[in-house]
Amino acid sequence: MQNLGFTEADWKLFRKRLPEWQERYMEGLVEEYKAFLSSEVPASTKFWELEKRLKNDRRKTGVLAEGISRSNMKFLMMDLINEGAIAEDDFDGFSDDFRDQLLFYYANVRKK
């Protein structure tokens, strides 16, 4: 079934991989937090900066994807690309048409 430029298999693969991508993305965030907390800045700066980062990061699709539906899948993928949660090699397994759309977005549109 073709729907909005992707197949049912693409939708199923997206739902399977999303938790894996989110876990990997959050592992990266935790490493960034650890590096920041190990820095030589005052404790109060660490506390307030970390609170600010956590508040911002928890809104990202790489942490919490809201509105997961077929009609939002492309937008969620674009968010994940823009956040750096996924890259080109994560497009493997998707249908050729959908993969081409993702590669075009990755190469030409994403926020760098």
For the regions a language model picked out, list residue spans one by one:
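Acidic, Ser/Pro/Thr-rich low-complexity regulatory regions
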Residues: M1-K112
